[in-house]
Each structure stands twice: as C-alpha cells, then as structure tokens.
Regions:
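Short acidic, low-complexity intrinsically disordered linear motifs used
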Residues: 1-10
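A short acidic-Thr-Gly-centered motif at the start of a beta-strand
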Residues: 9-11, 86-90, 138-144
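Alpha-helical substrate-recognition element adjacent to the catalytic core
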Residues: 13-132
C-alpha cells in the first residue's frame, strides 16, 4: 500500500532542459533555404523558428556542424543555467538533471563553447529541427521518472 506521506516525503526528480541557439547564446550561423538544388535565402535561428516552408523547400544546416562563430552569451539565461547546474550538484544523486537539448547534429561545438565559459553541462544533439524530436526526448526522460520538467527554448514551436 502506498502512503500519502511516502509520496510527499520522497525527493522529486527534476529535469531542467535548455535549448542552445538563441536561448543560451547567439552565434553567426545561418539556415540556408534550398529549392531546386540552390540556395534561395538564408535565415538566422530566430527567423527559422517562425518560418513556414513553402512546398519544395528544404533546409541546409551546415553552419551548425562546425565551431561556433562569434558566439555571444545571453547572460540572464546562462546565469539561470549555472544556477540549475549548481542545484543539481548539491542535490541527492539522480534527483536533478540539467541538459542542453539542441537541434544540432553535433554537440561538440556547444560543449567546447560552454567549457570555455567554465560550464560543464550535458549536451544532447538531436540532429533535427522537428519539434517532435525534442518532445520525444523529454517524454523519454519523464518515463525514466522525472516528475518536474523545466524547459527553456526560444522557439514557440518547441
């Protein structure tokens, strides 16, 4: 039998998830809109977040597969990340997890940049701009027992 006091006294499992591009930092990177095998326009991440593709358009994310160019932190969000990482370090093992969940295919450029700031964070590259991919990853974490999830992302689609 499960007792109410057992439920109330157990430590909650908290997951804090941060997007990277245009949430924690802005860098010189473009998404190239392709049609018929050629680039017809380029979008920054903020423009891409609200862009509705036309039939026949596809995207080229090559700028997101290499070292960050001219990255600039978004200070208030990075400070929040640092606070969440500090809480995770001070909590019971496994009670708190902080993750950078990025649409990028390669996490290393993000990891390297964060380490240059003295931030050691777990980076998960999902390799897709489809919001469902991030949602599916978060759902898997909930199924692993996380009962409180905080999510920060610049894109309303996510």
């Amino acid at each position: 039998m499960i007792k109410l006091t057992d439920i109330l006294l157990r430590e909650r499992k908290v997951l804090s998830v941060f997007d990277f591009d245009d949430t924690l930092a802005k860098a010189d990177a473009w998404i190239y809109v392709q049609q018929g095998g050629r680039t017809i326009k380029k979008l920054d991440p903020a423009q891409f977040a609200v862009y509705d593709p036309k039939p026949g358009e596809s995207f080229d994310f090559r700028d997101f597969d290499r070292k960050l160019q001219n990255p600039k932190i978004i200070k208030q969000n990075v400070e929040l990340l640092k606070k969440q990482l500090d809480k995770a370090r001070r909590s019971a093992r496994g009670a708190r997890k902080v993750t950078i969940l990025t649409a990028r295919r390669i996490g290393q450029p993000v990891t390297s940049f964060l380490r240059s700031l003295g931030i050691n964070a777990y980076v998960v590259p999902v390799g897709s701009s489809d919001p469902k991919v991030k949602a599916d990853w978060i759902e898997k974490q909930i199924l692993k027992g996380y009962d409180t999830v905080y999510f920060m992302d610049d894109s309303p689609k996510n």
